Structure formats: structure tokens, C-alpha cells
């Protein structure tokens, strides 16, 4: 049986979008309470009854988020000089894919109403 599961992670960060016009509100430094959905897919392990232990996903994602993104200015993170949701989701994919077999998508929730989903290279 093929399944997909997701785990949501949260972090706080500031950013500004340097490519938008100076009068655009996102050109100014501002912050978000980001939520990140990390989804993996694959065949259910019939013996265990699951695809993967959620703790295994957490052990990969949480240290990276806390060390590299939480309470940071995302513009200062190498590779995120223009930290749109689209760029952030791709950046996360590149960091996580080598460590999460079956990675299916990364969804970045910038607000409760605005999100971007990236499904791989």
C-alpha cells in the first residue's frame, strides 16, 4: 500500500524581499511564524504498519531548522538572499532530500493563508 505522510514544524524568522519595489510592504524587514510541512511517500511497512517513524523525520528536520533558520534574518542565510516562500521551499528540499528517503514535498506556510509547495528538483 502506497501512502504519504506529513509532519509540521514551526520556526520564527525575519526577512525582507529585496527584489520587490521599495514601496512594497515586503521590501521592509518583517517577521513570520513559519510552518513547514515535510511530506514523505512510499510503501507501507506491513509489519510495522507505518511508512516511517515520525521521530525519524523530526530528528532530521528539527536540528536544521533550529540551528540555521529559527530566530534568524533569512536574508543572512547563504542561499536565501531573496527569501521568498518559493526559494525557501527549494532551499529546504535541497538540504533535506539527501537525508529523507521518499521526500515528496515541502510546504512553506508564511501566514495562515499564504503557502508554497515544492515537489522536488
Task: Report the location of each language-model feature.
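Charge-rich, low-complexity N-terminal segments
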Residues: 1-121
Amino acid at each position: 500500500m502506497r501512502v504519504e505522510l506529513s509532519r509540521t514544524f514551526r520556526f520564527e524568522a525575519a526577512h525582507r524581499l529585496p527584489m520587490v519595489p521599495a514601496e512594497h510592504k515586503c521590501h521592509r524587514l518583517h517577521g513570520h511564524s513559519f510552518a513547514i510541512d515535510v511530506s514523505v511517500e512510499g510503501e507501507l511497512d506491513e509489519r510495522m504498519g507505518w511508512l516511517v517513524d515520525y521521530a525519524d523525520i523530526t530528528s532530521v528536520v528539527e536540528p536544521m531548522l533550529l540551528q540555521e533558520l529559527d530566530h534568524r534574518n533569512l536574508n543572512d542565510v547563504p542561499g536565501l538572499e531573496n527569501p521568498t516562500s518559493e526559494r525557501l521551499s527549494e532551499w529546504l528540499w535541497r538540504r533535506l532530500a539527501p537525508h529523507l528517503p521518499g521526500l515528496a514535498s515541502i510546504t512553506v506556510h508564511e501566514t495562515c493563508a499564504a503557502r508554497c509547495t515544492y515537489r522536488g528538483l
